[in-house]
């Protein structure tokens, strides 16, 4: 056709113009269409009419370049525009079906819903199939809306509860505001007092400076006086020497004068001389006259004789001359001797004078040097003190600002924590109300949901959020009933999931791993619990599904996440705590004392209920830092509860000073132990014996012959599954009741008739002389506070008390009296926790010391009250057959040992012994009276443990002993003294002896023996102290040496360490142990007492290592605190006072530690 080409072109242009006109109308309303159209609704119809394909649908719904619904709607219009008129027609039909208003807006016509296109493409069957699918979708949406309506109603009720709780919170906040203003006023008053104290401190500092100046002036004056004294001493010595010389010379002259002959003697000698001369002349004249008359022979003889006489005279003259010369020489020699003696005396005087002068100058030089050294030390000390004062002043200013900031932060944090606590309480109430509401509405929910509801919808609502298909959007409103604060107070799920409602739980309850028996028990008691307040631990004890178990956090936080179904009973801890103390303020609730009010449950309730996890969970993050997981710590706590509650405390027989005389014949009877508690009641204790107080009329016990006043001696039978024999005459009141209550099967009671003892016991109790038949003395190994530990008496570690009743008012408390340290008389009386409760309290204190310093301790403060309630419950632990306990018993015992090792380290011991919560860890021996009860308690589990690990030391590790049994001793003679730290002993002993204490103190004379003798004595007798003097000799001290000093009524000062205390006590010698506390504040004062120069850090480390030995002492010790002395002289005075004070005190000895 020649003209076909132009006509066809015109026709195509006309069609194109018509299409453009049609789409022009759509483009005019493009904004409204793209705003309200949901492409996900239109694409199924468009695809069924074969206008768009799968690729176009995927591009529209899932293209990343089209983030919003408007962009996707615009892209869909563009794609349909490319399809021409067919695209326009199908688009209008889809608008006619889904959006009638928009169809009327575009075309101006009313919708007829003919679906011509789909009828043409698919036929009437395709249209019917399409409409059925749409109906099913609408039904599903309607069911979802119904479910959403139920959830919104539940949410409404929840919001009403929250409104009530917010009202209560507002009241609490107003109370906190008033308390804040009150604390602010108190802070201002304290600030004024602080300013006043600072002024007083400044005045004291000024006074101290003036006194220091006066002291310096007095020291200078003392030095001048000392110099004058030295000069006077020199002059005195010189005058004494001169006086001595003069005295010697005057004595010689006096002797010469006294020995001089008298005048009468001289005259008499002269007369005698004249008479002798006259007689000599007469004889010469006679001789001459005789010569003349004699014959010649005679003359010759006379001449010869004369000659001889002359010669004799000459010889005599020579001898006289010689004698004269000798006398002259002797006189000269005597003169020289006297001269030399005088010179010698002069030289000796000069020598002694020079020696005295030398000594004086030497002493003066030493004095001057000491003074110079002292002046230098004082100068250095003054410079150092000045620098320290300046540094301390600047540090104080910095710390003052820091403390002010910390105070503000702590106040804000305190307010936040209290608000958070109120919110958590509100959350707990909210959860409790939801639990009750869900239990009520379970049937309504079953009826509200359609029976033909597909399982896929439920899984989408309660399981993980599945990815949306076909681009469908999420629902407009959430179906969760959980409050927005739940994520703050409970651990989040990983990954986050919706909270299951009751319908979801019922669908999978048959798959729960929890036993059906517990589930039925919970359902049976559900109606009984509706009117009571459930504890947090009971709120979370619902039986839950396996899928919900997977959502739990990897470590246990609290019992609200527990997988064990424990029905909350009428004895709920929280309810009883609130009922017992309804007027207690919120400040008191933050303390740790609330948990003990629930400990007054009877033994039946102990066996019926098992409460939530222990306080170990309150600081799970700290456990993780120590390498311990919460499950193992839970097993440790469960084991410890079982051990501490298996048997009460049993004092040894030696602690009771009551001696029972022989009584009447012993009788015995056999009864049924299961009903023994209801048939008779007991009275008495370990000091007076256990008596039958009353017997139920018509019971088997009455028929067997038991009557009031019969004394029970022995019980034989099955006690807690073991065949045992318990001596009831030495049992405490608590243990006797415990034994009677836990008998099973046939038991044999041995008794005797003792009406006199029973009447005396009843009379003494009526007169108020005694409270029960118990009487023994214990030493505390931990601090007990009346405000925090649910008792009426506050005691410190190492206090000695007299226990008078182990079941005071039939509760788990001991009535005791504080003991006077000098007279042993009972002072004020009150109650303390029983032995088992004290063991649990000791464990809690050890946990606090172990977790101190953790960053999460503040975050875990809100768990303290709840953790203590759950931990310190006198409950029955799980049986050894519990699969959660038995397989990991060895692991738990190992962790318990690790806990004891942690607190037994030297640095932890120093912190533990010097903290406010001081505890004393002593090693328990199976032979001791305290550990004997623990051994009986742990026997069953120890046997089970030995089957798993034969070399286990479980019994050795479980030695937490809160109370130690002690016995009083008296010593009239003066006791020896031991000092610790030992490095100070030698210096202190020397200073005490040199300071005028020789009348009261002395050192012990040691024996020097050979090596063989020493080895022999070591085997045969006790050696208190020994030291190797040389390779073949030893210096040793035996008890006999110390007793010899005590016999002189003096204190024996020993330089030995305190390790010899046990040997001394075993030898009946009771030493006084003095502990001189060394810390950073007073370490500089010990410089003069150290035997050799040591660094301060090394000396402090050695002292702290020695300090841990004090815990193992079987006796008490005295402590010299740093603030008691400021100088060595004051230290010696304080030591003397302490020794005198300890000498007057009673000696308390823990014989189990020997």
From Swiss-Prot:
Tissue-by-tissue expression: Detected in adult peripheral blood leukocytes, thymus, spleen and liver.
Listed Basic and acidic residues bias regions: 518-529, 573-587
Reported regulation of activity: Maintained in an autoinhibited state via homodimerization in which the CARD domain forms an extensive interaction with the adjacent linker and coiled-coil regions. Activation downstream of T-cell receptor (TCR) by phosphorylation by PRKCB and PRKCQ triggers CARD11 homooligomerization and BCL10 recruitment, followed by activation of NF-kappa-B.
GO process annotations (BP): B cell differentiation; B cell proliferation; canonical NF-kappaB signal transduction; CD4-positive, alpha-beta T cell proliferation; homeostasis of number of cells; positive regulation of B cell proliferation; positive regulation of canonical NF-kappaB signal transduction; positive regulation of CD4-positive, alpha-beta T cell proliferation
Coiled coil region boundaries: 130-449
Region (Linker): 111-128
One Pfam family, short name: CARD
Effect of residue 57 to D: In IMD11B; no effect on protein abundance; decreased interaction with BCL10; dominant negative effect on NF-kappa-B signaling; dominant negative effect on TORC1 signaling
The keyword Cell inner membrane appears for this protein: no
SUPFAM superfamilies: DEATH domain (SSF47986), P-loop containing nucleoside triphosphate hydrolases (SSF52540), PDZ domain-like (SSF50156)
Gene Ontology cellular component terms for the protein in this record: CBM complex; cytoplasm; cytosol; extracellular exosome; immunological synapse; membrane raft; plasma membrane
Biased composition regions of type Acidic residues, renumbered to the chain: 473-484
Any GO molecular function: guanylate kinase activity
Subunit note: Homodimer; disulfide-linked. Homomultimer; polymerizes following activation, forming a nucleating helical template that seeds BCL10-filament formation via a CARD-CARD interaction. Interacts (via CARD domain) with BCL10 (via CARD domain); interaction takes place following CARD11 activation and polymerization, leading to the formation of a filamentous CBM complex assembly. Component of a CBM complex (CARD11-BCL10-MALT1) complex involved in NF-kappa-B activation. Found in a membrane raft complex, at least composed of BCL10, CARD11, DPP4 and IKBKB.
Identification of the protein by name: Caspase recruitment domain-containing protein 11
Source organism phylogeny: Eukaryota, Metazoa, Chordata, Craniata, Vertebrata
């Amino acid at each position: 056709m020649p003209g076909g080409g132009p006509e066809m072109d015109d026709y195509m242009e006309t069609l194109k113009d018509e299409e453009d006109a049609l789409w022009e109308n759509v483009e005019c309303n493009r904004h409204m269409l793209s705003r309200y159209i949901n492409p996900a609704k239109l694409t199924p119809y468009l695809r069924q009419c074969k206008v768009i394909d799968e690729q176009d649908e995927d591009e529209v719904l899932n293209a990343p370049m089209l983030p919003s619904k408007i962009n996707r709607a615009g892209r869909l219009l563009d794609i349909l525009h490319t399809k021409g008129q067919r695209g326009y027609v199908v688009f209008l039909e889809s608008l006619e079906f889904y959006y009638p208003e928009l169809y009327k807006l575009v075309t101006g016509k009313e919708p007829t819903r003919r679906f011509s296109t789909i009828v043409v493409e698919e036929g009437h069957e395709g249209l019917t199939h399409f409409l059925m699918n749409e109906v099913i979708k609408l039904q599903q949406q309607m069911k979802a809306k119904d479910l959403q309506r139920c959830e919104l109603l539940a949410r409404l009720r929840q919001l009403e509860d929250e409104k009530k709780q917010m009202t209560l919170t507002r009241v609490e906040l107003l109370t906190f505001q008033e308390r804040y203003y009150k604390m602010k006023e108190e802070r201002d008053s304290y600030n004024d007092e602080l300013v006043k104290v600072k002024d007083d401190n400044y005045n004291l500092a000024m006074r101290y400076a003036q006194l220091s100046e006066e002291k310096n002036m007095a020291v200078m004056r003392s030095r001048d006086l000392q110099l004058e004294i030295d000069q006077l001493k020199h002059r005195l010595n010189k005058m004494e020497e001169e006086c001595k010389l003069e005295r010697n010379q005057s004595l010689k002259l006096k002797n010469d004068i006294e020995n001089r002959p008298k005048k009468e003697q001289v005259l008499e000698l002269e007369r005698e001389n004249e008479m002798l001369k006259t007689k000599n002349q007469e004889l010469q004249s006679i001789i001459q006259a005789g010569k003349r008359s004699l014959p010649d022979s005679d003359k010759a003889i006379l001449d010869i004789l004369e000659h001889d006489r002359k010669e004799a005279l000459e010889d005599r003259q020579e001898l006289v001359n010689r004698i004269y010369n000798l006398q002259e020489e002797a006189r000269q020699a005597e003169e020289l001797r006297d001269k030399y003696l005088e010179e010698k005396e002069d030289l000796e005087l000069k020598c002694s004078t020079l020696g005295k002068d030398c000594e004086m100058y030497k002493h003066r030089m030493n004095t001057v040097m000491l003074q110079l050294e002292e002046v230098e030390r004082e100068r250095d000390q003054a410079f150092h003190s000045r620098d320290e004062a300046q540094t301390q002043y600047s540090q104080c200013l910095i710390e003052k600002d820091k403390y002010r900031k910390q105070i503000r932060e702590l106040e804000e944090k305190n307010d936040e924590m209290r608000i958070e606590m109120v919110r958590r309480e509100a959350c707990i109430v909210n959860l409790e109300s939801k639990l009750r509401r869900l239990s009520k509405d379970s049937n309504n929910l079953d009826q509200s949901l359609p029976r033909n509801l597909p399982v896929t919808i439920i899984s989408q609502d309660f399981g993980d959020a599945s990815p949306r298909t076909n681009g469908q959007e999420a629902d407009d409103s959430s179906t969760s009933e959980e409050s927005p604060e739940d994520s703050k107070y409970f651990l989040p799920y990983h990954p986050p999931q919706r909270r299951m409602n009751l319908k979801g739980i019922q669908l999978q309850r048959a798959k729960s791993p929890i036993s059906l028996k517990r589930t039925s028990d919970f359902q049976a008691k559900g109606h009984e619990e509706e009117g009571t307040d459930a504890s947090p631990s009971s709120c979370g004890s619902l039986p839950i599904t396996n899928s919900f178990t997977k959502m739990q956090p990897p470590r246990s936080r609290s019992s609200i996440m527990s997988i064990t179904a424990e029905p909350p009973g009428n004895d709920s801890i929280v309810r009883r705590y609130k009922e017992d103390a309804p007027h207690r303020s919120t400040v008191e609730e933050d303390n740790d004392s609330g948990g003990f009010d629930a400990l007054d449950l009877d033994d039946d309730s102990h066996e019926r209920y098992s409460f939530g996890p222990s306080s170990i969970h309150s600081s799970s993050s700290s456990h993780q830092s120590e390498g311990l997981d919460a499950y193992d710590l839970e097993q440790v706590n469960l084991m410890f509860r079982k051990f501490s509650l298996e048997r009460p405390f049993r004092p040894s027989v030696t602690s009771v000073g009551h001696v029972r005389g022989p009584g009447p014949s012993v009788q015995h009877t056999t009864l049924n132990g299961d009903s023994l508690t209801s048939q008779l009641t007991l009275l008495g204790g370990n000091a007076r014996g256990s008596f039958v107080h009353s017997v139920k009329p018509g019971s088997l016990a009455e028929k067997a012959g038991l009557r009031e006043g019969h004394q029970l001696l022995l019980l034989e039978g099955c006690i807690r599954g073991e065949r045992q024999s318990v001596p009831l005459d030495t049992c405490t009141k608590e243990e006797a009741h415990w034994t009677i209550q836990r008998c099973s099967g046939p038991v044999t009671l041995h008794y005797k008739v003792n009406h006199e003892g029973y009447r005396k016991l009843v009379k003494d109790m009526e007169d108020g002389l005694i409270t029960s038949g118990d009487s023994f003395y214990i030493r505390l190994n931990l601090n007990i506070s009346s405000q925090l530990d649910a008792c009426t008496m506050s005691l410190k570690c190492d206090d000695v008390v007299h226990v008078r009743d182990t079941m005071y008012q039939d509760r788990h408390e001991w009535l005791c009296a504080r003991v006077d340290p000098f007279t042993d008389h009972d002072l004020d009386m009150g109650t303390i926790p029983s032995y088992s409760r004290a063991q649990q309290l000791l464990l809690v204190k050890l946990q606090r010391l172990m977790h101190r310093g953790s960053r999460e301790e503040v975050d875990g403060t809100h768990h303290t009250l709840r953790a203590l309630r759950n931990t310190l419950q006198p409950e029955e632990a799980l049986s050894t057959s519990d699969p959660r306990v038995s397989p990991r018993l060895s692991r738990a015992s190992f962790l318990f040992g690790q806990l004891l090792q942690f607190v037994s380290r030297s640095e932890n011991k120093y912190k533990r012994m010097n903290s406010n919560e001081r505890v004393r860890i002593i090693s328990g021996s199976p032979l001791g009276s305290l550990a004997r009860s623990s051994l009986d308690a742990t026997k069953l589990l120890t046997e089970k443990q030995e089957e798993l690990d034969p070399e286990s030391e479980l019994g050795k590790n479980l030695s937490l002993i809160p109370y130690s049994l002690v016995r009083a001793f008296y010593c009239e003679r003066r006791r020896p003294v031991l000092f610790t730290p030992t490095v100070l002993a030698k210096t202190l002993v020397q200073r005490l002896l040199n300071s005028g204490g020789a009348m009261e103190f002395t050192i012990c004379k040691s024996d020097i023996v050979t090596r063989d003798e020493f080895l022999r004595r070591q085997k045969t007798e006790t050696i208190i102290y020994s030291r190797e003097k040389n390779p073949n000799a030893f210096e040793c001290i035996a008890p006999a040496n110390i007793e010899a000093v005590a016999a002189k009524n003096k204190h024996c000062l020993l330089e030995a360490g305190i390790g010899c205390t046990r040997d001394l006590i075993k030898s009946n010698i009771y030493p006084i142990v003095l502990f001189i506390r060394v810390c950073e504040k007073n370490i500089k004062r010990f410089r003069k007492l150290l035997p050799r120069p040591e660094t301060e850090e090394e000396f402090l480390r050695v002292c702290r290592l020695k300090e841990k030995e004090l815990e193992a002492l079987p006796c008490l010790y005295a402590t010299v605190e740093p603030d008691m002395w400021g100088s060595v002289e004051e230290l010696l005075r304080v030591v003397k006072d302490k020794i005198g004070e300890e000498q007057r005190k009673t000696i308390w000895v823990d014989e189990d530690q020997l």
